[in-house]
Every structure is written in C-alpha cells, then in structure tokens.
Amino acid sequence: MSQEYLDFELPIAELEAKIESLRAVSEQDGKIDLDDEIKRLQKKSEELTKKTFANLDAWQVSRMARHPNRPYTLDYIEHIFTEFDELAGDRAFADDKAIVGGIARLDGRPVMVIGHQKGRTTKEKVRRNFGMPAPEGYRKALRLMEMADRFNMPIITFIDTPGAYPGIGAEERGQAEAIARNLREMAQLKVPVICTVIGEGGSGGALAIGVGDKVNMLQYSTYSVISPEGCASILWKSAEKASTAAEVMGLTAQRLKELNLIDSIVAEPLGGAHRDVAQMAENLKQQILADLQDLAPLSTEDLLDRRYQRLMSYGYV
C-alpha cells in the first residue's frame, strides 16, 4: 500500500521523496555512495515529523483519524489476536459488513472481538458501507456480545465510524432502536468490556459498541457527537468552518481524557498508526492486556456497579 500524505505533511513527503530518489540512484549505480546524504535527510525528516506532530491542532487530528492508510479493525485483529473465527448475521435480516466480529484468542485466552470496518478500495468501501452500520450490524454485534456473556468471554470492541448509516431503509428497520438496545444491554453484560476508538468515533454509531468498563482512544483518534463539518454546517452555516468547529468540540483524546470520559490514550508511532502498524498493534495489545488484568479481580457485582457508576458520572465536570 503506497504511503499517502495529508497537506500539513507535505514538507515531510518532499523529504521522503528525495530519500527514495537517492536510494534508487544508489541501487542503480553501486559506484555512487549516497549513504551519508540519505542518513542526513532521514534525520532531517524524523526531526520535521516530530516537530509537525508535536503541534497538531484538533482539525489536523480529525484528519489523521480518517487517514486513508490508517489501520482498521481487521488489521488489528490480524496483529493482536490468533485463531480469529468471524461470525456473521443478526439472525433477523442480513449480515452487515460494516461490523465485523467473532471469537479469537488473546495470548491464548478466548475473547469476543467486534469492530467497525471500513474499506480501502472503492469496491470494498461500498461493501463495508464506508464503516457506517445499519441496524442489522448493531444487532449482529449485540448477538455476539450476548454469546460472549453466556460463555464468560471478555468483549473487545474497536470503534471507527463516521456514524450510523442514516438511510431510509436503516431508519425503517429501526436504527435508533438498535442503538438504544445496545446501550442498555451493554450496560448489563456480566463480562469485562474494553472499548477502543481507533479512528473516528462518530456519535451514536460509535456508542452502540462503546459502552464498556474501559474506554481508550488512540492518540490521533476522535470521539464526538457530530463531525466537525456537520457541526460547522449547523452553527456557522458553512462546512468551511470545520477547523473552528473541531477546536470548540473537544473531540481529541487529550481533551476527553481531561474530562474523564476515557480511561487511557494509546500512543501512536511517530507520524501516526499507519507508519508502523505492527508497533501500533503491540501498543494497543499491551493496553488491552493491562485493562483485562485491572478488571480481573472484580466480582460480577462489582463490575456491574463500577460500570453503572461510570455511566452515571457522564455529564458532570
């Protein structure tokens, strides 16, 4: 997969292009030694990347959360879990490809993994409905959660959606009811639930698999009731004010941690999760393992009480 750069990364992209060009020349003509120049440019690129990513504003973080190269749920499943067995369908209407889920092992322990899934190619994006689930997707997720509850398996969810699908068919099949039912049922599950926002956390579409004992966010992910463009269109009547909206919405991991709405921020590799997927997956795996260890001593009653108190604390500063 070719590397893509956002506009604020263009100076970095130019340096990387120069490095690749020098490497190509060096490989074509072994008599030309360009190692020192390549090392100098690599150091300069790393320093520029550090400087750029040390000062990202909320709008830039929003765009990083949607980066086309960013790892999706199936990428993390491949790197973190073993023996993944995908389960399909809501047993009522259809199998929604915008939600993936199934049984897997995490360091040998059976777990239920559920997450939003976007696509990379045009065909795959359409098949996954751009990561926007219909009611049958959320009902599939709930079916798998109830299965995990019966067999005492921890539930791991990965959140990455611009929102629930707002189409007429989805509304006719009960989109709001499906989301509301998931919120209610997840609050009562008797097994540990660990949720992580890996990209976009868009409104009720994210919350429908986001009620948990631990809620984490990747460093450059977002979590909000509406997209910055949507907010700008409502408040300023112009999507061009999206950058202003992003700042006032408080949608970054750092801001939500300050408000105690999430538990942990999972560090991303320099330049974002897509720059080193294996390292990002390892960071996320260690956070999930730490969360499971933290929840392990709790009895079912304590787990449910802790989750209830957590939910009831929302809205208080």
Swiss-Prot record:
One of its GO terms (cellular component) is acetyl-CoA carboxylase complex. It catalyses: N(6)-carboxybiotinyl-L-lysyl-[protein] + acetyl-CoA = N(6)-biotinyl-L-lysyl-[protein] + malonyl-CoA. Keywords: ATP-binding, Cytoplasm, Fatty acid biosynthesis, Fatty acid metabolism, Lipid biosynthesis, Lipid metabolism, Nucleotide-binding, Transferase. Pathway: Lipid metabolism; malonyl-CoA biosynthesis; malonyl-CoA from acetyl-CoA: step 1/1. GO terms for molecular function: acetyl-CoA carboxylase activity; ATP binding; carboxyl- or carbamoyltransferase activity. Residues 40-294 form the CoA carboxyltransferase C-terminal domain. InterPro entries: Acetyl_CoA_COase_a_su, ClpP/crotonase-like_dom_sf, COA_CT_C. The keyword ATP-binding applies. One of its GO terms (biological process) is malonyl-CoA biosynthetic process. Pfam families: ACCA. Acetyl-CoA carboxylase is a heterohexamer composed of biotin carboxyl carrier protein (AccB), biotin carboxylase (AccC) and two subunits each of ACCase subunit alpha (AccA) and ACCase subunit beta (AccD). NCBIfam families: accA, AccA_sub, PRK05724.1. Belongs to the AccA family. Component of the acetyl coenzyme A carboxylase (ACC) complex. First, biotin carboxylase catalyzes the carboxylation of biotin on its carrier protein (BCCP) and then the CO(2) group is transferred by the carboxyltransferase to acetyl-CoA to form malonyl-CoA. This is Acetyl-coenzyme A carboxylase carboxyl transferase subunit alpha. It comes from Actinobacillus pleuropneumoniae serotype 5b (strain L20).
